[in-house]
Amino acid sequence: MTLTRFVTKNAFRNKRRSLLTVLSIAFSLLLLTFMMTLWHAFSLDEGSAESAQRLVVRHRVSLTFALPGFYREKIRSIPGVVSVVPVSWFGGIYKDQKPENFFAQFGTDPDEFFKTFRDIGMPDDQIKAWQRDRQGVIVDDTLANKYGWKLGDRIMLQGTIYPVNLELNIRGIFHSSPDNKSVYFNTKYVEESVPLFKGQAGTFSILADNPGT
């Protein structure tokens, strides 16, 4: 007797029991779906409508492989692309390697960052200060509150992937929804310190003119 026939035979041996079993499982799944829907509706922040217009381009094999920098202009030439900016993971250590001191760190292009991430809020004077300072960094307000960071403070990120320690000046404190707990600095600072990585990008973030592009 095959397994399928055995299961079918026993399922129809007591039709009432089988029906109640199926109904109880279905009800449990329905209840779980309902609870997850409520939790999603009341607890999660979907972010801005503009975030739906952003795309990320990465290496097709893995995030550990960098993309050539000249891809940026190729992507920019695609119809529907409003702006494109490199975003490269740094993966440095702040203070120590304790999990509570871990946060995301990215190298990017300050001149085009806010053209792509227009839903991130930061005063214009802070944006200009960041763009002027090659060692400038902007930090999420959640991190600023956690560590007591203020404008003008200097922080150091110890390199792990890149053989360089970055000494960064806090030039801006931004707010995003939801909180992204990240910092962004000028990728040219890393390229000048480690020429081997010049002209590469971990990913490209793209802003499309509409979500359907």
Language model segments and positions:
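N-terminal Sec/SRP start-transfer signal
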Residues: 1-32, 43-44
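Helix-boundary and loop/linker segments of multi-pass membrane transporters
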Residues: 9-13, 107, 130
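Hydrophobic, regular-secondary-structure patches
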Residues: 26, 30-104, 122, 126-133, ...
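Extracytoplasmic
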Residues: 52-54, 70, 98-103, 132-134, ...
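Soluble periplasmic/extracytoplasmic beta-strand elements of cell-envelope proteins
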Residues: 54-58, 85, 102-107, 138, ...
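A generic structural motif
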Residues: 61, 109, 174-177
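Mechanotransmission and gating elements of multispan inner-membrane complexes involved in transport
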Residues: 66, 78, 159-213
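Diglycine-centered glycine-rich loop/turn motifs
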Residues: 111-138, 144, 150-157
